[in-house]
């Protein structure tokens, strides 16, 4: 029997399960903003910096791509410590520290004049991006959502993809003025936009007097949800084949994505002969397909008729 609930009513129920906007969705919006900042200013603009740094200092692509590779190593090694820090101090503090490092790193980048200083600055930026980015944000989202967790994660990731669409703006700034000016402005944007935004992040729904997904549950149901999360530890996870298969698949995917991020724009400028802005426009097409993928994810995780009722 078809549901009598309209799509608009379903959306309203999703975002306002108790007559007001569930605070978890504000956290998702903030996460999307932070992902946007990290994506447009650094992760997806790194190829632009390799081009301008190669032109100014004649550093080889091997040296420049090596710096990016070290950031990925740093991210992997920092992961376990980062998880402990978030559990110990909460995501808001860790995000703030990370964004401060991220912003300062860009201000230092605008003054770099040697390969050693560049590598040290990239290290500061990469630690800042890790602490003030995806993994820390996901801790809050996972705590705030259960039934709608997939949708919440997908919506938060929209920020990163939208950041990729805006990479041509960064390229235009580098061509119109100078990459050092762009780096300095980027540092200011991170501090002025990112740090105030993450002050609204909360670790768990209880801190705002709310419940998971914004749905009022009976006491025994709340206990069941908490026990389900607490009973499956990281030690249990590493014993399952699924953990290692997902990790391997994710690692292979990131290898491909990282290669495109670092080498696509340099290839289009040096190999094909395009201008920096033209190359970035072609690069931004990657983000369009990312958005399509996220859209499919949201489509296939839409509420079932049973959930809407």
Each PLM stretch: what is its role?
Residues 101-113:
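C-terminal ends and interior cores of transmembrane alpha-helices
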Residues 69-82, 284-296:
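Central cavity-lining transmembrane alpha-helices of secondary-active solute carriers
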Residues 117-132:
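Hydrophobic core of transmembrane alpha-helices in multi-pass small-molecule transporters
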Residues 46-47, 241-284:
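Extracytoplasmic gate region of multi-pass secondary transporters
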């Amino acid at each position: 029997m078809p549901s009598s609930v309209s799509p608009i009513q379903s959306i309203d129920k999703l975002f306002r399960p108790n007559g007001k906007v569930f605070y978890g969705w504000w956290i998702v919006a903030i996460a999307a903003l932070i992902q946007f900042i990290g994506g447009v200013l650094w992760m997806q603009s790194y190829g632009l910096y390799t081009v301008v740094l190669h032109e100014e200092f004649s550093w080889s692509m091997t040296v420049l791509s090596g710096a990016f590779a070290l950031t990925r190593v740093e991210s992997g090694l920092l992961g376990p410590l980062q998880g402990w820090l978030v559990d110990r101090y909460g995501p808001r503090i860790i995000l703030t520290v990370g964004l401060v490092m991220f912003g300062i790193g860009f201000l230092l980048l605008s003054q770099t004049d040697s390969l050693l200083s560049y590598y040290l600055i990239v290290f500061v930026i990469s630690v800042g991006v890790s602490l003030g980015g995806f993994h820390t944000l996901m801790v809050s989202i996972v705590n705030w959502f259960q039934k709608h967790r997939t949708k919440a994660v997908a919506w938060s990731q929209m920020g990163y993809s939208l950041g990729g669409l805006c990479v041509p703006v960064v390229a235009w700034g580098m061509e119109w003025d100078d990459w050092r000016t762009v780096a300095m402005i980027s540092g200011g944007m991170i501090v002025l936009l990112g740090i105030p935004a993450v002050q609204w992040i909360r670790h768990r729904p209880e801190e705002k007097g709310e419940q998971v997904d914004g749905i009022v549950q009976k006491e025994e149901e709340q206990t069941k949800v908490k026990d389900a999360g607490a009973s499956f530890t990281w030690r249990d996870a590493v014993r399952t084949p699924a953990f290692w298969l997902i990790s391997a698949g994710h690692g292979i995917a990131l290898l491909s994505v990282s290669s495109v991020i670092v080498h696509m724009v340099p290839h289009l400028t040096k190999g094909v002969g395009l201008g920096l802005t033209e190359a970035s426009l072609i690069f931004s097409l990657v983000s369009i397909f990312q958005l399509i993928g996220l859209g499919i994810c949201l489509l296939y995780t839409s509420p079932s008729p049973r959930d809407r009722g």
